[in-house]
Amino acid sequence: ACNKKDCWVSGIMIDLNGFKQINDNYGHAEGDLALCIVADLLRKSFSEYGVVTRYAGDEFVIMLNTTDDQLIQKIIKSAKKNFVTENEKNDKPYQLSASMGYAITNLSNETIDDFMNRIDEQMYQDKMKYYEHNDRRKSK
């Protein structure tokens, strides 16, 4: 919420894990289908809480309508569960998953560029945790 002194915002940066391997192993048409599935999952997971946008390639940004840290963590956890559910029900030879990073800021104290860099860094930290436990070369 913004007023003359403060402008609090929150956002989530999302990047698909292993998307290049989907394109390389199964073709760009399958990669495009995977992006559509992910976009639908993200809309279902986040539309109640903000606006989902495709940022670049396999990256998405959600600008949230809440700055409640616990709620943001809860909806990220729920979104990751939605990916697991999607993988269980589809018959794809690969797993869909995403790394997610978020931040809450007062734009009176931080530029939007710095904010975007911060959520990108948080997403990168999540991606490092993902790849510590998942070998990039494995598929379903």
Regions inferred by a protein language model and the residue ranges of each:
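PAS and PAS-like sensory/regulatory domains
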Residues: 94-99
